[in-house]
From Swiss-Prot:
Amino-acid positions noted as binding S-adenosyl-L-methionine in the UniProt annotation, renumbered to this chain: N72, S74, R78, E114, D137, D191, L192, R207, N208
Name of encoding gene: cheR
Name listed for the protein in its UniProt record: Chemotaxis protein methyltransferase
Keyword Cell inner membrane on entry: no
Organism listed in the record: Listeria innocua serovar 6a (strain ATCC BAA-680 / CLIP 11262)
Keywords, alphabetical: Methyltransferase, S-adenosyl-L-methionine, Transferase
Alphabetical list of Pfam families matching this protein: CheR, CheR_N
Keyword check for Transmembrane helix: no
Domain CheR-type methyltransferase: 1-262
The protein's role, per its UniProt record: Methylation of the membrane-bound methyl-accepting chemotaxis proteins (MCP) to form gamma-glutamyl methyl ester residues in MCP.
Species classification: Bacteria, Bacillati, Bacillota, Bacilli, Bacillales
Domain of life: Bacteria
Amino acid sequence: MIPDLEKDYLYFTRVVKRDLGLDLTLYKETQMKRRILSFIVKKKYITFGEFFKHLKKDALLLDEFISLITINVSAFFRNRNRWDVLEKQVIPRLLEDSRGKLRVWSAACSSGEEPYSLAIMMERSVGTRHYDILATDLEPAILKRAVIGEYQSRQMEELNEQERRSAFIEKGDTYQILPEYRKAIRFRRHDLLTDYYEKGFDLIVCRNVLIYFTAEGKHQAYQKFADSLRRGGVLFIGGSEQILNPADYGLATLNNFFYIKT
């Protein structure tokens, strides 16, 4: 066993939070510690302290580290039946209460499949210029991929033929989302655990991310999401997630995986 790695982890989480603004203690410790230890050994550092010194000086190493601690699993219209509920039941309800553009936030958007799915759906349900989508993620490299919006054919499996034809241009063995959809989305770096949350959203989509947070991390995120919704706004979460006491956050269950701000 390489000396000091285990006992230095607590110190490492403190200095990473203090100097880099990343709170690792709000992620599940066993999983996070295992991933970071593996990364440190791979990079041939002896202690967390040595690794941290290089982390502060090396921008590329920091980008790698951020990529390591973020979860980048995404797909177009993931769990399609839930998206059908969103389009046929939730969006019409939001439109009834809306006074202008629908404000939508795709939180932890990864490489862009989720916000582009939202844009495709909004285009046919709401129409051009009647919605605004903010898409955020912690990892700069993954956001760059999202902005480009280029995907392999295997990533397009959940899209039907009409969606492929209307929203993408084929480029050899890849597909790129059309410029009008890219322009409809504001991509920005954001840390769900530490950064400020914008207010007044009609819809917030954050799916299959908070399962990696501790109970305290989830509590903080759900409260901030609730505060960011307008009254009557909706939070859409993943199929492996559940808010056990939504009333604690001023929310009520609207449908499976959909919560409305009361």
